[in-house]
Structure formats: C-alpha cells, structure tokens
C-alpha cells in the first residue's frame, strides 16, 4: 500500500499521513469470525493500573485469527484482504474447499484468488504453512511457533520477517527481525513469506487526537511531575533529574538497563542476543 500525504489545511493535517488501503478488498468482516472485545483501560481484575498510557479509543471487535495453521492437506482460496484494528498487519479471509472459513495474517504478495495450504507436504510458496524441518534453508518466514501446536508467537507484526539459517538435529536456527539468532524445535510450524503492510512504519500520526482514536493516552515526562509521583520530579524550573541514571516511575534504572532475567531457561537456545 502507498502512503497518502495531506496538504497543511490545518495544524493537525500538517505532516500527517495515512495508508491508502489499496490492498483492502472489503470493509465488512466475516461475522462468524468476530468476537466481542471489552476495553480494559490498562487495568487488571483488581481495577489497578498495570499498563500506563492505555484507554479510550474507537470501539473494536476482535477478529479470530488462525495462528496454528493446522488444517492440513485441505487447500483454501483467498477471498478477501481486510483491515484489522487489533494489529498492524492486514488479514486474509480463507475459504477452504470443505466450507470452513478462517482468517490468517496476510503476507506480502498474497492476492485474492490465490490458493494456500498447510501441512508437511505443502509447496514452498507465500502463505503456505509447514513444519520448520520441511522448509529449505534461507527461506523467509513469519508466524513462527515456539511450542508445536501452540500457534505462531513470533514475527507477526506488519513488515516483520525471519530467516531460516540452518538445521541441527531436532532444532533449526532462525534469525529474527530483532537480530537475535536462536534455536527453535524443528516440529514447530511457520508460514512462508514476509508479513504484509510494510508501509505501516512510515505513517505519521500527525495529531494527538488520532492517537486517542487508537486508544493511546498521553505520556507525561517524569521531570514534569512532582517528586512524590516520579524520581525525576520536583526542583525549581527545568531541573536536572538529580540521579546518575534515568529511573522508571518505580525507581528502577531504565533507558538501556537490561531487564531480562538472569539464567533464564531459554538462554541455552539463544545463539546471538538481539541488537539494542
């Protein structure tokens, strides 16, 4: 999809851009694959805020996505490419020959009318899902499982891709979008191709109100708060933070401080750590 830019007819329009949605073929989702989605506003079951900067936004319905891709040996035809408000990637509605309908993540190059398939015998072509042991070395993949049968957990956002680098026994070596190289069980599944909607990262939100439509609330600087609200707060005027390193609102070091648990069980599968 192309980026649509606007003339500066107002302060909010100046610099703003949107996607032109040329790839989207319908604005009416499949009703049988919709589920209600209740807003949490960043609160847990006790009503306490656990995630800041969330709340409000346009009402949404959840699209049930097939991340498992476990419908083996049954071909399906791409019926539509649709917008999904719950993720950065677009989704594709698949009509299988046995009558079932499922949504999948729409990879780059997938078009209406194309046929896709899942299973060990599927061809190596965009949109097909196979066990990692059946995918040739060097192939670009997405929607990668970490546990067989659990469904894809890695490489699912717009424009994301990973590459299969090699095979060693029961494991395959995969380079992820972050630069991390890690081993994944060879019986886990992945989908061929790169996730579509590559231009998503080029969109300029343009104004605060558009962020609010997306359910994003303002991010207030700690230095603009009082000292009882943030370690950076207080002082006369624009005072320095008064500490040797930046802190989170709860007094923990931040901005570069590593938060991954030491000696985590999955460390042995990571060959090369991700880039900063």
UniProtKB/Swiss-Prot annotation:
Organism: Halalkalibacterium halodurans (strain ATCC BAA-125 / DSM 18197 / FERM 7344 / JCM 9153 / C-125) (Bacillus halodurans)
HAMAP family according to UniProt: Ribosomal_uL2_B (MF_01320_B)
Function per UniProt: One of the primary rRNA binding proteins. Required for association of the 30S and 50S subunits to form the 70S ribosome, for tRNA binding and peptide bond formation. It has been suggested to have peptidyltransferase activity; this is somewhat controversial. Makes several contacts with the 16S rRNA in the 70S ribosome.
Identification of the protein by name: Large ribosomal subunit protein uL2
GO terms under biological process: cytoplasmic translation
Domain of life: Bacteria
UniProt region (Disordered), positions on chain: 36-58, 214-276
Keyword presence, tRNA processing: no
Pfam families documented for this protein: Ribosomal_L2 (PF00181), Ribosomal_L2_C (PF03947)
MF annotations from Gene Ontology: rRNA binding; structural constituent of ribosome; transferase activity
Gene name linked to the record: rplB
Family: Belongs to the universal ribosomal protein uL2 family.
Keywords per UniProt: Ribonucleoprotein, Ribosomal protein, RNA-binding, rRNA-binding
Subunit architecture: Part of the 50S ribosomal subunit. Forms a bridge to the 30S subunit in the 70S ribosome.
GO CC term, one of those recorded: large ribosomal subunit
């Amino acid at each position: 999809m192309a980026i649509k830019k606007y003339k500066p007819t107002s302060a909010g329009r100046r610099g703003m851009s949107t996607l032109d949605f040329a790839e989207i073929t319908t604005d009416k989702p499949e009703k049988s694959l919709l589920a209600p989605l209740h807003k949490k506003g960043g609160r847990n079951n006790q009503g306490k805020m656990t995630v800041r900067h969330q709340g409000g936004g346009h009402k949404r319905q959840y699209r049930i996505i097939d991340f498992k891709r476990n419908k083996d040996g049954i071909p399906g035809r791409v019926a539509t490419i649709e917008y999904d408000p719950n993720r950065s990637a677009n989704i594709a509605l698949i009509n299988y020959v046995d009558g079932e309908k499922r949504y999948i993540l729409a990879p780059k190059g997938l078009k209406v009318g194309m046929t896709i398939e899942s299973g060990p015998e599927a061809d190596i072509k965009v949109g097909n899902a196979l066990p990692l042991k059946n995918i040739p070395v060097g192939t670009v993949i997405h929607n990668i499982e970490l546990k067989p049968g659990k469904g894809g957990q890695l490489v699912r956002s717009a424009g994301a891709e990973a590459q299969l680098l090699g095979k060693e026994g029961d494991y395959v070596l995969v380079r992820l979008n972050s630069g991390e190289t890690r081993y994944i069980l060879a019986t886990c599944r992945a989908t061929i191709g790169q996730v579509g909607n590559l231009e998503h990262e080029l969109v300029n939100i343009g104004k605060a109100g558009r962020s609010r439509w997306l359910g994003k609330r303002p991010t207030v600087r700690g230095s603009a708060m009082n000292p009882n609200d943030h370690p950076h707060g207080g002082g006369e005027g624009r005072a320095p933070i008064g500490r040797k390193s930046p802190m989170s609102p709860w007094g923990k070091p931040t901005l570069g401080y590593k938060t991954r648990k030491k000696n985590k069980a999955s460390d042995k599968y990571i060959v090369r750590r991700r880039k900063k």
